[in-house]
Amino acid sequence: MSQASSGFTPAAQVQHGSSKGAFNSAYIPTEEEKRVFRECNSESFWYRSLPFSAIAVGITQVLVAKGMLSPSPRFGALPKIAFAGIFGYIGGKMSYVRVCQEKFMKLENSPLGEALRQGRLRHVSSEMNQPDFDPNSSESQQPGSESVQQPATEVSSATESYSSYTSDYTYSTPSQSYETTPFSSGFSDSGPANIRDDLPSQAPLYMEEDVPKRKPVLYEELRNKNRENYEVTLPQKNQTQMKPQMEVMQPKKEAKKNKYGDSWEE
């Protein structure tokens, strides 16, 4: 952008300086910027601060009336309502900052608007093109490229060291070096591994020998045993039932009685 199109004069550029230190405590805004400041103050008050304060005060009064907020014993609900109004006023002002920035950026001959535009463009470009234009990113990527090239050399060196190790220390497979031994010889110091190999295979044999095998009991055998027991107990029951009957069937001898009706024996 040229000086004629932007409206900047050399004096203005010297006064405001570079983009980094453009605005200091001695900056004097232009008439257009003052007008935008007044518009932002009035619009932020009527469109944001006043509605937000009214809503906050109304909500606080409702909460105090319903008992959700306890009023002060000395001042009542006034402190809470005042705090809600101040909070709504500040929140409304802060919410209108973005709109004011847009208004300043629309000004053509405003150093403040130009600074805001450059700051936004710089922020957007840093977010969009940071991996492409950041010099530190290229330096940070160099160790990654070196690490990509290193695995091939590391693999080759690892294979060489492994081959040298295997040539120095030969070994055999477990099936070739270990031979199975009986369980009795497994308790020697030379064969601790054989104990683990023989125990699982020989333990079931000893368990089977200790436990006697039981023949399955058939239903017919149980039935015959019950019949034998019943036949043995049946005569005993018959004898016990016949004894009372024999006693009942024996007639009693009539004793002689005297004239008074008493029985007496000779």
Curated annotation (Swiss-Prot):
Disulphide linkage map: none
Biased composition (Polar residues): 135-155, 179-188
Organism (species): Danio rerio (Zebrafish)
Region (Disordered): 127-213, 225-266
Family listed: Belongs to the OCIAD1 family.
Membrane-spanning residues: none
Name under which the protein is recorded: OCIA domain-containing protein 1
Source domain of life: Eukaryota
